[in-house]
Amino acid sequence: MLTQFSLDMREAAQQYRKPISLARNYYAEVALNPQSEEWFAQSIPNGLQNYNWVALMAMPYMENAKNPTKWLNHLIDVTQVTPLAKQKLLYELQAKDWRTNKPIPTKELSSWMRMMRIRGIHNFGYYPDDQFTNTPDMQILKKELSAKAALQ
């Protein structure tokens, strides 16, 4: 229902501006627990088929994961078998632990990005970015976000 509403909105807006790309944020739980598709009105296969991008909240601390890297690897395993995932699924990493209100250590965030690149995933980002405190530290992250890193 929400997907169709988004598509209808795009169609209405395209009379004023073309092309219009659509993206939608999805909870990781939708990938990890098929029953939750109904709770959240989200389906990754449906989203990948209908949207230009699906941003998946790959946020292990928000999900209370005991081992964040293992949790992320499992999320990748589950999602990358879905058709169109390699092209259209974007993993949104967390840069802040909202439970403690503290930033995720930049080296940990960087290691997640490196792990994703090693696994062949190039569509990832992070949230939030605090440019006033340089959190996460861009000198460290740019090594993982640069075009040079993508070619390695």
Where are the model-predicted features located?
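Aromatic-lined carbohydrate-recognition surfaces of secreted/lumenal glycan-active proteins
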Residues: 1-40, 86-98, 127-129
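Substrate-binding cleft of secreted/luminal carbohydrate-active enzymes
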Residues: 45-69, 73, 78-152
